[in-house]
From Swiss-Prot:
InterPro entries: G_TrmE, GTP-bd, GTP-bd_TrmE_N, GTPase_MnmE, MnmE_dom2, MnmE_helical, P-loop_NTPase, Small_GTP-bd. This is tRNA modification GTPase MnmE. Coiled coil: none annotated. The lineage of its organism: Bacteria, Pseudomonadati, Spirochaetota, Spirochaetia, Spirochaetales. Its cofactor is K(+).
Amino acid sequence: MSNLFQREDDIVALATPLLSSALCVIRSSGISSIEKFSKMFSDPKRLLEASGHTIHYGYLIDKEICEKLDEVVVCIYRAPKSFTGQNSIEVMAHGSPIGIKRIIGCFLKVGFRMAEPGEFTLRAFLAGKLDLTKAEAVNELISAKTNKTHSLAVNKLSGSLFAKIDLIKKDILNFLSALSVHLDYETSEYEVAIPFEIISKSRDELKRLVDSYNTARKLDYGIALVLAGSVNVGKSSLFNLLLKEDRAIVSSYAGTTRDYIQASFEFDGILFNVFDTAGLRETTDFVEQLGIVKSNSLIKEASLVLYVIDLSARLTNDDLKFIDSYKGHSKVIFVLNKMDLEPNRQTVEFFNSGNINSSNLVKISTKTLFGIDSLYDKIRSLTCFDYIDIDAYDVIVSSSRQAELLKKAYTLIIELLNKIEKDISYDMLAFDVYEVLNFLGEITGEVTSEDVLNNMFKNFCLGK
């Protein structure tokens, strides 16, 4: 059996990163955790007599070698009024990596074991402190990469997804109750009305939750934004501008970027994975050729392409080839850069002649920042509102486990509606309804197995 289910063990873990910092937090939980910890505290009697939700100042002491390890503040929690439902201790110590390791070592000496990933949250779930949707929201909150994903995780932590699932379950239970009454009294002279419309409503609610998972994946993985163009047109300058930091080398030498550089930035709550690619041109340099091949591959796979053109120079053959291939493509924005320089007459005439729809053009200068706001507006119009419709959902499902169970419940509901149309016997309908409720119960954790919990909580970080 996994250590995750050894609830009688006293566990300890570092809840903050193992880095040099002003403070760190070490947390522990278990039936005997306070008694064991008191053996390494400077005033053990005070801790043993302490009430829950109290804070105590003192020193941690390795009594085997009679040496003080650190000056600390200790928070005491008494069962059942703690995150895990057990006696728990949180130690705030100085963030010295060496000191932290010595303190953890002292915990182990007095009888604690290292916690498994997610074990504190699992104990909270097993103690009925939170359901599985909230437990998964804890992990989503910790790993959130943007303001939007953080807000969605907080909403789920406050119970929004559980409330939605619970509402669907109550509707289906009402249907099942009516079905059961009908089966009990089908030979009676009384006719029991069965609210079949409830199943149609539940189907629609489940469909919205299933669809929301696709939106969640886009939020989690981000939008692939590729900067492409000929050499020395300002792609790397634009890359640095989007990131608001100098990540790419900017040089007047053509071919400085010989392979792609990837980084991420947040815009309007959406994560963008931006790629600064090698300039497109004919070259005999083998390494640069490989970079150009990769550039073309990234362009094809991208959600959005910013094709950068030097407005002060003549269009290259590679520019013309790209324009011919992508001039009507909705995922491409043609960025006319270097507006701060004298424009090339032929290049200006080419774009003024209507070869490209003006709605796909943005004029900028990475040097003076001219037109940058217009570029952001264009990115927003092509991605945030069209590509990811966040506001269409009151609750968004982010977990693949939840999504899979919702798909199963939705499929069964569809089958149930088909059976209703075919006048299948009510006892057969009841069997399918129980199956739907079972899948929904697995989402919240009312119906689950040890294997499911092991698989879910192993993806949590240590100390959570």
